[in-house]
Amino acid sequence: MSVLFTLKQYVKMVIQNKYLPYIYQKACKKPVKKGKILFADAHHTELTGNMKPVYQKLKNGGYDIQLYCEDIQTMPVWRMIAFMKEFMQVYAQAEYVFINSYFLPVSSCRKRKETTVVQLWHSGGLMKKMGYDTTEDIPKYYKGNPTANYDLVTVSASCCEAVWEKALHLSQGTAKALGLARTDIYFDKEWNADNKCRFYQRYPEARNKKICVYAPSFEGNAAHPYNRGIESGILDIMKHLEKEWFFIIKVHPHMEKNYPMYHCDFSTEELFAVTDLLITDYSSVVYDYLIYQKSFLLY
């Protein structure tokens, strides 16, 4: 693990454990506002995953909704701190907060009881360790609890509840099998047909070929991700089969900077409609793909 990464973690801990709680406590002088809802994401500049359909459902309900979505990995430190400060000031008066993955400001303080934090966890299942079950996700030296203050964590099935509670150090009953809002779109015939049409317009050379999507996960952590699959010889296999197959390599969002040559204009979800074979390693994308009842290969 690099010295720079470790240094960043310590700076992050100081901000999370000292500065943000101070900002929150000052803002708590004002009461919680009924109907005030926040959607927050520190990895994307727009709503993604389960948050998007939940927002669409709530936006016309007369609620006071605010979005806090930024990719903090791309922000200068001063902007990141300003973003978190603004969030904490509003967090102190929010009735509900929705997040889609780790969002450290939410867990940086002891929140008010009147505020409910809902973690709309993004994956449909697990094929690898996460959270406190792996030191790569949450280093042992990290002081703080990135999953504190969660009142509800939504998961895809009852068999996932105990697994999530163990991995994220949640109280029993916090994880509930309420399903994933984002998977509803997979049953929309018009959406699937539109994705097919756009795909063949973008890749006319894929017509009359079988479509294979290679969508590996990543190893390491979000700050220093890596992937062994792409370097393991799978590209040679693709080359031998390119007469009959059209291959799309869809790397994990954390890996896009490392592999810009594999950029694809379509999200993995949008590719499902045209995919004949999905190849992945231990990515949770396979749980989504199973809805289409098509072939997949773990490599």
Residue ranges: model-predicted function:
Residues L47, L67, V117-W121, L168-Q172, ...:
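Tryptophan-centric aromatic hotspots in well-structured domains and transmembrane helices
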Residues K36-E190:
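Active-site and donor-binding regions of nucleotide-sugar-utilizing enzymes
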